[in-house]
Amino acid sequence: MKTHKKKKSLGGLFSHSSSSPNLKSFLTEEVIHEQQQQQQQHNNNNNNNNNHQRQPSTTSTSSYIDSASSSIEETSGYLSKTSSSSSLPSSPLHNQNQNQNGNIQLNSSSGSLNNNEQQQQQQSISQTSSPNTSSPIMGKKKPSRLAQAFKRVKNNGNNKLKKEIEELTNKTGLNQQYTHSNLPFNVVESDIDNGSSGGTTSSTGNIISHSKSPSSSSSSSSSKKHQRKSRFIEPISQSTEDYTDIPRIIKMSVEYLFEKCLLVPGIFRESANAMELQRLSQLFEKGGDIDLSEYTDPHCIGGLLKLYFREKPIPIFPYDLHKRIYSVLNEEDSNIKVKSLLESGLGKGQFLILRYLFELLNAVSINCNVNFMNYQNLAICFAPSLIQSFDLSCYDVIERLIENYHSIFGVVVPVVDNSSNVSSSSLAHPIIGGKSETNVSLNNLTVTILDHGDINNNSNSSNNNNSSSSSSPYKKSPKPSPKSSPKLNNRNSISPKLSSSTSFRKSINLSSNSIMISDEVQQEQQNQQQQQDEQQDEQQDEQQDEQQDEQNSNSTSINTSSSSITRPRKGSTVQYLNRINTCRRPSSWTNNNRIKQQQHHHHHHQQQQQHQQHQQQQSSSSESNSSLTSSPQKRLNSVNGLESYEEGKNVNEIYSSLKEESSKLPKKSSLNRQMTIVNSNNIGNGDEKNSDCTTSDEDEELKISKPIIRSTSVNEILKETNDDNNNNDQINNSNSSNNIPKTTITTTTNNTTTTNNISPIVKSKSQIITSSAKVTPTPTPAPMQTSSFLSTKQTNSPSSSSSPSSTVSSTSSSPSSSLSSSIDNKTMSNVNYNRFQPANRTVSSPNVRNFSVPTTTTTTSIGSNSFVSPRFIGKRTTPSIFSPRKQSICKPKNTTSSLSSSSSNISKSTNSTPTPTPAPILTSTLSVNSTSSSSKLQEKALPTKTTFITQTSSPLLLPQPLTSTSTSTSTSTSTSTSTSTSTSTTIPTPTPTTSSFKSNSFSTSNDNSNNNNNNNNNNNNNNNNNNNNNNNNNNVTSPTIVSSPSSPTSPISPTSSTFIKGHSHSNSLSQTPSSSSSSLGNRLTAPGRQLNHTNSTSSLISKFNQIDTPSGINQGWKGGVVVQKKQDPVKKSLAIFEKE
């Protein structure tokens, strides 16, 4: 038994230890000391991070020495004892198990332990056989195992081979052979990026990378420590095709350079500021929100883009790929081969980033005439950063990729206009060569084409790769404006320049030789374009129809029901435009509207002529013989200012007497509408309703349709008119042809003074009031004839007598093409129009002469009498006490009258039918410039059958007017000479449209009128054959004008007349003084009414002329009921017209 034990112990001793009785002499202390020194030198070569693990290894060696020495002493003479003590059955087995466990944990490493080191460790462990000796290694087993594991890794031969490979690849760029197809931008091991921070360093200082084992939890935790995101990089997913996950620094830099820096000279070539470049790189590393929209240094952004590609641990362009591309550059179809090499040799993320970058470089090179950066210069700047090689062939490869970008990458880049300094990358770019933008999907090898007008930033619509091959209906979307580019402050924001959308894609088959577009796609494109063209044509037709309907709505509204009065909506834009067209505006304001309205009015010209013929037929048979009552004829403006007074009588007395007389008359209500201004004496007293009324310049633009109360002076005028008409016979019988009572009218202006001695001749009442105005219903605007006689006599302005254009005319512009040219050239050139000039009203004198009436005449049919109320024109010289918008609105009355007197007679007649829309004018202007300071007019009765033309601003749609000018020079016995120039404008129509009145009472007086006219011409030593010819005609379209020795004459109204007492007022016009006069039968010069108003007030008459055409005198007008058209709804309202 003992021998067996000895054998067993000896066997264990010799199997686990190198010591034997024959080797005792060799084991000395010197050998042990050498081994200890070798062990310390080996430990000094370890990494500094593992210094704390050196102590266990040293302790193990010391224990190994102590145990070795003790075993030697014990075994020196007592073999059986040592064998028994050192032959513990558990100790070798336990140590073997520990070594096996250690080897299992280190399986993740790529190397194995050295044999010498294993033998030494086994010796050191096996020699601790004595149970009595203390073993210091037993308490520190775990640190010793870690130390042993690090020793194995350091001495591993396989890692040395890897170090050599890394040294070679860093020099030649061959490390790309270890990369995968998809470049992992988000994971880069720190031993490559940060040197020795994550790995251990050998004696040569090279970096050693660690291999990872997914089965080991310790190795996975250690691998996380060695991994981090590379800066500026974000993970690239499958949706990179939409450029949503491109690294932010590339995306923002390229967008900024595309937008602002394509024309910057030396972009990418000039060096950037190092401090600013460092600051930008730190901002991107922090990952905060960065806004480059207001950044001003383009070279720093270009330098940042180059810095990103240069500092990448792995080049984005593989070295071996560039060699293969270089080998096929000189071959045929090199572009197709290069494209195939890029698709096969690059990952998806790499291809999209390079395409995004080379798009910018190609756009820069296109504008090389401005920025001086051609293909060669750009290749020199980017080749070292993209390929990371000093091989000169890389420059040729990058240059070819930039130059042939369209055929290689399949994306179109715009040509930037040299006149601008900014190229917007967010715009839809024009297609070069008729091609459109493409995106390449590497999985199914299809190219998706985007139309240049259909580029959207809907990145979510094409996240899947299969969506690129699906086709959808083609649609055109409008190009965004250049100012609509979004700011680049969003992390994932990208310009829609290259973004794809499935709704605009068309599949294209890829072949190895060329990109063939299928016939089906071409047919679809043609069909879609045809459909779009048809849709556009239909839309244009619809828009034109709508515009025509809107234009026709104004004219067709005349034919609507005329049984009720409707007020236009507040702020009516349609009527506001009509007001502008009829007002005296500069020609540049209304040229566009005139052109449009000329086309519209010309279309309805034939219908108007038919209605005019029908109107004249009805008017000839509708002469009324009723008694003098209030007429429902709408007053265009106030007649309060026409109150006359006898010569030499105080104005205040007349004003008070008229008030007393008017208070006695019954007050009648009317549906008329007019605008009144409060009298200066009645301000604040609550008497605004009965005050006199006038208008202002600013009211020309306003449609004032408020009912007001007419002042009581109208009734007084009616009463005086009746009295004057009763006295007409007596005055006519008492006055001879040569002895006529004279009335002196003095007209005072700013620089001129005119004195007219008028000797009126009055006919009997039967000759005066025999016919009424022609008022017949028409669905279209009725023709209106107006006349104005402006007698001007200047002493200090000889230039005003040079041409008729220098005279004052109160004609206003109309939308008609026939009249707009002649009126603008002759009358509107002298108008200095001030849009917001208020009406100047005198505060001191509240009587009637302070109120102005625009130039117009209206014929009022009252019973069997037809009388005319004249209107005059004047300019105010005193400031106004009222703002144009502070006018009181009252209710009107149903009477329209004109003032008449026995000493001076004025008559004007109009054939007016008030319509809601304006019509062109029939005007006749007579301008006279006299060289004498005083004139005397002695006239005889003229024939009654003359055409009378009144002046108004109610327009008429008729052809181009005929202008006739007659000039006569006469000499009187008072040695005063005068030159009379008359211009008459009439409009010829197929049927008579002038207001020539047919009356049986005048048929017997034609011969007498001709004789009187001939006598008058003989007395003046002047023969006017035109007058005789005009008087012999019943329907004449031009007025008969007879010039006297010292004063001009006025057109004569043949039928209706009223007589107004002579009076004089102070008047001032804008250019020259004027006095209007007209008479019936007898040649009368009206007293020069001094009215304070500007020239533009003549166009106010169309403002109130908005009543519908009556169906007939005996039907709609007999009962005193006024009907008005319904106003069309307007498109928009202006706040300026919403005046209460």
From Swiss-Prot:
Residues 10-26, 35-71, 83-136, 193-222, 456-475, 482-493, 520-533, 550-566, 607-631, 724-759, 797-822, 891-914, 952-1058, 1065-1079 have a biased composition (Low complexity). Residues 1-145, 189-236, 455-504, 520-644, 661-700, 720-759, 773-927, 952-1095 are annotated as: Disordered. It is found in: Cytoplasm. Its main location: cytoplasm. GO terms for biological process: small GTPase-mediated signal transduction. One of its GO terms (cellular component) is cytoplasm. SUPFAM superfamilies: GTPase activation domain, GAP (SSF48350). The keyword Coiled coil applies. InterPro entries: Rho_GTPase_activation_prot, RhoGAP_dom. Residues 28-55, 517-548 form a coiled coil. Residues 597-606 have a biased composition (Basic residues). Residues 534-549 have a biased composition (Acidic residues). The record marks 269 as: Arginine finger. GO terms for molecular function: GTPase activator activity. The keyword Coiled coil applies. Keywords: Coiled coil, Cytoplasm, GTPase activation. Residues 234-409 form the Rho-GAP domain. It holds the Pfam family RhoGAP. Residues 72-82, 494-504, 572-596, 632-641, 672-684, 773-796, 823-854 have a biased composition (Polar residues). CDD domains: RhoGAP. SMART domains: RhoGAP (SM00324). It comes from the Eukaryota. Rho GTPase-activating protein involved in the signal transduction pathway. This is Rho GTPase-activating protein gacF. It comes from Dictyostelium discoideum (Social amoeba). The lineage of its organism: Eukaryota, Amoebozoa, Evosea, Eumycetozoa, Dictyostelia. The gene is gacF.
